[in-house]
Protein backbone atom coordinates (compact mmCIF):
# COMPACT_ATOMS: atom_id res chain seq x y z
CA UNK A 1 0.00 0.00 0.00
CA UNK A 2 1.03 3.58 -0.58
CA UNK A 3 1.73 5.91 2.34
CA UNK A 4 -1.59 7.65 1.70
CA UNK A 5 -3.43 4.32 1.84
CA UNK A 6 -1.66 3.31 5.03
CA UNK A 7 -2.64 6.59 6.67
CA UNK A 8 -6.21 6.19 5.45
CA UNK A 9 -6.44 2.78 7.09
CA UNK A 10 -6.17 4.50 10.47
CA UNK A 11 -9.62 6.06 10.04
CA UNK A 12 -13.09 4.65 10.62
CA UNK A 13 -15.95 6.92 9.55
CA UNK A 14 -19.69 7.04 9.01
CA UNK A 15 -20.54 5.94 5.44
CA UNK A 16 -22.07 9.30 4.51
CA UNK A 17 -18.82 11.03 5.36
CA UNK A 18 -17.32 9.42 2.27
CA UNK A 19 -19.87 10.21 -0.42
CA UNK A 20 -22.77 12.00 1.24
CA UNK A 21 -26.31 10.75 0.77
CA UNK A 22 -25.16 8.37 -1.99
CA UNK A 23 -23.29 6.26 0.57
CA UNK A 24 -25.55 6.64 3.60
CA UNK A 25 -27.55 3.51 2.84
CA UNK A 26 -25.64 1.72 0.08
CA UNK A 27 -22.14 0.60 -0.78
CA UNK A 28 -22.57 2.54 -4.01
CA UNK A 29 -20.29 3.32 -6.91
CA UNK A 30 -19.91 6.79 -5.39
CA UNK A 31 -18.62 5.21 -2.20
CA UNK A 32 -16.18 3.14 -4.22
CA UNK A 33 -14.95 6.25 -6.00
CA UNK A 34 -14.57 8.08 -2.68
CA UNK A 35 -12.35 5.28 -1.40
CA UNK A 36 -9.84 6.08 -4.12
CA UNK A 37 -9.38 9.47 -2.48
CA UNK A 38 -10.06 8.51 1.14
CA UNK A 39 -8.90 4.88 1.61
CA UNK A 40 -10.30 4.51 5.12
CA UNK A 41 -10.02 1.36 7.19
CA UNK A 42 -13.72 0.92 7.79
CA UNK A 43 -17.12 2.34 8.60
CA UNK A 44 -19.39 2.40 11.62
CA UNK A 45 -23.14 2.20 11.01
CA UNK A 46 -25.67 4.14 13.05
CA UNK A 47 -29.47 4.30 13.00
CA UNK A 48 -29.46 6.68 10.02
CA UNK A 49 -27.66 3.99 8.02
CA UNK A 50 -30.33 1.37 8.68
CA UNK A 51 -33.54 1.49 6.65
CA UNK A 52 -34.40 -2.20 6.24
CA UNK A 53 -32.74 -5.44 7.27
CA UNK A 54 -32.03 -6.37 3.64
CA UNK A 55 -30.55 -2.94 2.91
CA UNK A 56 -28.10 -3.28 5.83
CA UNK A 57 -27.10 -6.80 4.83
CA UNK A 58 -26.57 -5.71 1.23
CA UNK A 59 -24.49 -2.72 2.30
CA UNK A 60 -22.20 -4.85 4.44
CA UNK A 61 -21.85 -7.59 1.83
CA UNK A 62 -21.09 -5.16 -0.99
CA UNK A 63 -18.66 -3.08 1.08
CA UNK A 64 -16.00 -5.75 0.73
CA UNK A 65 -16.06 -5.37 -3.06
CA UNK A 66 -15.78 -1.59 -2.79
CA UNK A 67 -12.69 -1.84 -0.63
CA UNK A 68 -11.17 -4.62 -2.72
CA UNK A 69 -11.69 -2.66 -5.94
CA UNK A 70 -9.96 0.32 -4.32
CA UNK A 71 -6.92 -1.85 -3.66
CA UNK A 72 -7.14 -1.72 0.12
CA UNK A 73 -7.80 -4.41 2.75
CA UNK A 74 -11.32 -5.54 3.59
CA UNK A 75 -12.96 -3.03 5.91
CA UNK A 76 -13.83 -3.05 9.55
CA UNK A 77 -17.64 -3.00 9.55
CA UNK A 78 -18.60 -1.79 12.98
CA UNK A 79 -21.61 -1.02 15.12
CA UNK A 80 -22.34 -0.09 18.74
CA UNK A 81 -24.20 -3.14 20.03
CA UNK A 82 -23.77 -3.34 23.78
CA UNK A 83 -27.19 -4.83 24.39
CA UNK A 84 -29.91 -3.60 26.71
CA UNK A 85 -32.15 -0.57 26.39
CA UNK A 86 -29.66 2.19 25.63
CA UNK A 87 -27.01 1.24 23.06
CA UNK A 88 -28.04 -1.56 20.72
CA UNK A 89 -28.32 -0.10 17.21
CA UNK A 90 -29.40 -3.38 15.62
CA UNK A 91 -31.63 -5.00 18.22
CA UNK A 92 -33.36 -1.73 19.10
CA UNK A 93 -33.95 -0.72 15.48
CA UNK A 94 -36.96 -2.99 15.08
CA UNK A 95 -35.68 -4.04 11.66
CA UNK A 96 -34.15 -7.37 12.55
CA UNK A 97 -35.61 -10.57 13.97
CA UNK A 98 -33.07 -10.84 16.78
CA UNK A 99 -33.49 -11.38 20.48
CA UNK A 100 -32.95 -8.47 22.84
CA UNK A 101 -30.73 -8.94 25.86
CA UNK A 102 -30.98 -7.20 29.25
CA UNK A 103 -28.96 -4.22 30.39
CA UNK A 104 -25.46 -5.13 31.51
CA UNK A 105 -26.26 -3.80 34.98
CA UNK A 106 -28.86 -6.55 35.31
CA UNK A 107 -26.42 -9.14 34.00
CA UNK A 108 -23.77 -7.97 36.47
CA UNK A 109 -26.23 -8.01 39.36
CA UNK A 110 -26.72 -11.74 38.78
CA UNK A 111 -23.08 -12.31 39.73
CA UNK A 112 -22.91 -15.01 37.07
CA UNK A 113 -20.28 -14.48 34.35
CA UNK A 114 -21.97 -17.16 32.26
CA UNK A 115 -24.81 -14.71 31.65
CA UNK A 116 -22.34 -12.18 30.27
CA UNK A 117 -20.92 -14.86 28.00
CA UNK A 118 -24.42 -15.69 26.76
CA UNK A 119 -25.05 -12.02 25.98
CA UNK A 120 -21.77 -11.73 24.09
CA UNK A 121 -22.47 -14.88 22.11
CA UNK A 122 -26.02 -13.77 21.27
CA UNK A 123 -25.06 -10.26 20.17
CA UNK A 124 -22.02 -11.33 18.18
CA UNK A 125 -23.93 -14.22 16.64
CA UNK A 126 -26.56 -12.08 14.98
CA UNK A 127 -24.07 -9.34 14.12
CA UNK A 128 -21.91 -11.85 12.27
CA UNK A 129 -24.96 -13.22 10.45
CA UNK A 130 -25.88 -9.71 9.29
CA UNK A 131 -22.32 -8.97 8.16
CA UNK A 132 -20.70 -6.90 10.91
CA UNK A 133 -17.20 -7.85 12.01
CA UNK A 134 -16.58 -5.31 14.81
CA UNK A 135 -18.70 -4.52 17.86
CA UNK A 136 -17.84 -1.53 20.05
CA UNK A 137 -18.52 -3.56 23.19
CA UNK A 138 -18.20 -4.67 25.94
CA UNK A 139 -18.43 -1.71 28.30
CA UNK A 140 -15.51 -2.12 30.73
CA UNK A 141 -16.38 0.92 32.82
CA UNK A 142 -16.75 0.42 36.58
CA UNK A 143 -19.77 2.37 37.80
CA UNK A 144 -18.29 3.99 40.91
CA UNK A 145 -20.34 7.18 40.60
CA UNK A 146 -24.07 6.41 41.03
CA UNK A 147 -24.88 9.83 39.55
CA UNK A 148 -22.97 9.16 36.34
CA UNK A 149 -25.19 10.48 33.53
CA UNK A 150 -24.01 8.34 30.62
CA UNK A 151 -22.86 4.87 31.73
CA UNK A 152 -25.42 3.75 34.32
CA UNK A 153 -26.98 0.38 33.38
CA UNK A 154 -24.52 -0.01 30.51
CA UNK A 155 -21.93 -1.07 33.12
CA UNK A 156 -21.81 -4.49 34.75
CA UNK A 157 -21.54 -2.79 38.13
CA UNK A 158 -19.38 -1.14 40.77
CA UNK A 159 -17.10 -4.07 41.68
CA UNK A 160 -14.00 -3.95 39.44
CA UNK A 161 -13.26 -7.65 39.80
CA UNK A 162 -16.82 -8.64 38.89
CA UNK A 163 -16.90 -6.20 35.98
CA UNK A 164 -13.58 -7.60 34.80
CA UNK A 165 -14.81 -11.18 34.96
CA UNK A 166 -17.94 -10.27 33.00
CA UNK A 167 -15.97 -8.36 30.39
CA UNK A 168 -13.42 -11.16 29.96
CA UNK A 169 -15.96 -13.89 29.26
CA UNK A 170 -17.90 -11.62 26.95
CA UNK A 171 -14.75 -10.88 24.96
CA UNK A 172 -14.08 -14.59 24.54
CA UNK A 173 -17.67 -15.34 23.52
CA UNK A 174 -17.68 -12.60 20.91
CA UNK A 175 -14.40 -13.76 19.42
CA UNK A 176 -15.72 -17.32 19.21
CA UNK A 177 -18.75 -16.00 17.31
CA UNK A 178 -16.51 -14.28 14.75
CA UNK A 179 -16.85 -10.64 15.79
CA UNK A 180 -14.03 -8.44 17.08
CA UNK A 181 -14.87 -6.90 20.47
CA UNK A 182 -13.64 -3.48 21.58
CA UNK A 183 -13.50 -2.85 25.34
CA UNK A 184 -14.43 0.72 26.27
CA UNK A 185 -14.02 3.52 27.52
CA UNK A 186 -10.43 3.55 28.77
CA UNK A 187 -9.31 4.77 31.31
CA UNK A 188 -12.86 4.43 32.65
CA UNK A 189 -16.01 6.56 32.29
CA UNK A 190 -17.87 5.23 35.33
CA UNK A 191 -16.45 7.72 37.83
CA UNK A 192 -17.31 10.90 35.92
CA UNK A 193 -20.18 13.26 36.67
CA UNK A 194 -20.32 14.44 33.06
CA UNK A 195 -21.22 12.97 29.68
CA UNK A 196 -18.35 13.21 27.18
CA UNK A 197 -20.90 13.39 24.35
CA UNK A 198 -21.84 16.88 25.44
CA UNK A 199 -18.71 18.30 27.06
CA UNK A 200 -15.64 17.71 29.16
CA UNK A 201 -15.76 14.60 31.36
CA UNK A 202 -13.31 14.43 34.25
CA UNK A 203 -12.12 11.79 36.69
CA UNK A 204 -10.20 13.01 39.71
CA UNK A 205 -8.87 9.54 40.46
CA UNK A 206 -5.16 9.22 41.11
CA UNK A 207 -2.99 6.79 39.17
CA UNK A 208 -3.09 4.40 42.14
CA UNK A 209 -6.87 4.60 42.42
CA UNK A 210 -7.34 3.99 38.70
CA UNK A 211 -4.99 0.99 38.83
CA UNK A 212 -6.93 -0.51 41.74
CA UNK A 213 -10.33 -0.05 40.12
CA UNK A 214 -10.86 1.31 36.61
CA UNK A 215 -7.93 -0.49 34.97
CA UNK A 216 -8.91 -3.92 36.33
CA UNK A 217 -11.56 -4.77 33.69
CA UNK A 218 -9.28 -3.58 30.90
CA UNK A 219 -6.47 -5.80 32.19
CA UNK A 220 -8.83 -8.76 32.22
CA UNK A 221 -10.11 -7.91 28.74
CA UNK A 222 -6.53 -7.79 27.44
CA UNK A 223 -5.70 -11.12 29.12
CA UNK A 224 -8.80 -12.61 27.46
CA UNK A 225 -7.44 -11.63 24.04
CA UNK A 226 -9.45 -8.47 23.35
CA UNK A 227 -8.08 -7.15 20.04
CA UNK A 228 -9.32 -3.56 20.43
CA UNK A 229 -9.61 -1.01 23.21
CA UNK A 230 -11.50 2.26 22.83
CA UNK A 231 -10.00 5.27 24.59
CA UNK A 232 -12.54 7.79 25.81
CA UNK A 233 -12.34 11.57 25.87
CA UNK A 234 -11.94 11.54 29.64
CA UNK A 235 -9.69 13.97 31.43
CA UNK A 236 -7.53 12.51 34.21
CA UNK A 237 -5.66 15.54 35.62
CA UNK A 238 -4.35 13.63 38.65
CA UNK A 239 -2.51 11.35 36.23
CA UNK A 240 -1.65 13.67 33.35
CA UNK A 241 -1.22 16.90 35.26
CA UNK A 242 -3.35 18.66 32.63
CA UNK A 243 -6.84 18.65 31.12
CA UNK A 244 -5.97 16.79 27.93
CA UNK A 245 -8.50 14.04 27.13
CA UNK A 246 -7.12 10.51 27.48
CA UNK A 247 -7.75 9.98 23.76
CA UNK A 248 -5.11 12.60 22.97
CA UNK A 249 -2.68 11.78 25.77
CA UNK A 250 0.53 9.87 25.07
CA UNK A 251 0.86 9.29 28.81
CA UNK A 252 -2.51 7.50 28.93
CA UNK A 253 -2.22 5.61 25.63
CA UNK A 254 1.48 4.85 25.26
CA UNK A 255 2.42 5.05 28.93
CA UNK A 256 -0.49 3.32 30.65
CA UNK A 257 -2.49 1.33 28.09
CA UNK A 258 0.48 0.13 26.05
CA UNK A 259 3.12 0.27 28.80
CA UNK A 260 1.59 -0.60 32.16
CA UNK A 261 -1.26 -2.77 30.85
CA UNK A 262 0.75 -4.31 28.01
CA UNK A 263 -1.91 -3.87 25.33
CA UNK A 264 -0.55 -4.64 21.85
CA UNK A 265 -3.78 -4.55 19.85
CA UNK A 266 -5.70 -1.81 18.05
CA UNK A 267 -6.35 1.40 19.97
CA UNK A 268 -9.58 3.11 18.87
CA UNK A 269 -10.57 6.65 19.82
CA UNK A 270 -14.15 7.47 20.71
CA UNK A 271 -15.87 9.72 18.18
CA UNK A 272 -14.16 13.00 17.42
CA UNK A 273 -17.59 14.58 16.97
CA UNK A 274 -18.26 14.45 20.71
CA UNK A 275 -18.44 17.59 22.80
CA UNK A 276 -15.48 16.64 24.99
CA UNK A 277 -13.26 17.03 21.92
CA UNK A 278 -14.88 19.53 19.57
CA UNK A 279 -15.23 22.16 22.29
CA UNK A 280 -11.43 22.32 22.49
CA UNK A 281 -10.11 20.97 19.16
CA UNK A 282 -11.25 20.61 15.59
CA UNK A 283 -11.61 17.02 14.39
CA UNK A 284 -8.51 17.17 12.20
CA UNK A 285 -6.27 18.37 15.00
CA UNK A 286 -7.75 15.77 17.36
CA UNK A 287 -7.10 12.97 14.86
CA UNK A 288 -3.46 13.98 14.48
CA UNK A 289 -2.98 14.25 18.24
CA UNK A 290 -4.54 10.80 18.73
CA UNK A 291 -2.21 9.20 16.18
CA UNK A 292 0.78 10.94 17.76
CA UNK A 293 -0.27 9.71 21.20
Which residues fall in each region the model found?
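Boundary/entry segment of secreted carbohydrate-active catalytic domains
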Residues: 1-25, 270
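Short beta-strand/loop segments at the ligand-binding rim of alpha/beta enzyme cores
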Residues: 4, 11, 76, 178-181, ...
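Enzymes and membrane/adaptor proteins characterized by extended Gly/Ser/Thr/Asp/Glu-rich
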Residues: 16, 33-163, 185, 190-204, ...
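Structural motif corresponding to alpha-helix initiation and N-cap regions
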Residues: 25-29, 215, 283-284
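Structured alpha-helical segments in the cores of large, soluble enzyme domains
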Residues: 30-36, 135, 174, 215-224, ...
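Short helix-capping segments at alpha-helix termini
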Residues: 66-73, 176-178, 225, 259-264
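Phosphate/pyrophosphate-binding betaalpha-module
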Residues: 166-187, 193-196, 206-228
Amino acid sequence: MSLEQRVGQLFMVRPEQLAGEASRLAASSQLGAALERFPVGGVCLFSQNMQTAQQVEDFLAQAHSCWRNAGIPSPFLAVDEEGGDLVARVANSGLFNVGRVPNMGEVGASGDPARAADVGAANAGYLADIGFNVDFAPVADVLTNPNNPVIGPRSFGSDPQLVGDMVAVQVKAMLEAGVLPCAKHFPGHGDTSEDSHTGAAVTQRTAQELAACEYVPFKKAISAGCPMVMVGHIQAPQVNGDNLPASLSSQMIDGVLRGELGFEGVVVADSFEMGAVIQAFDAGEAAVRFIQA
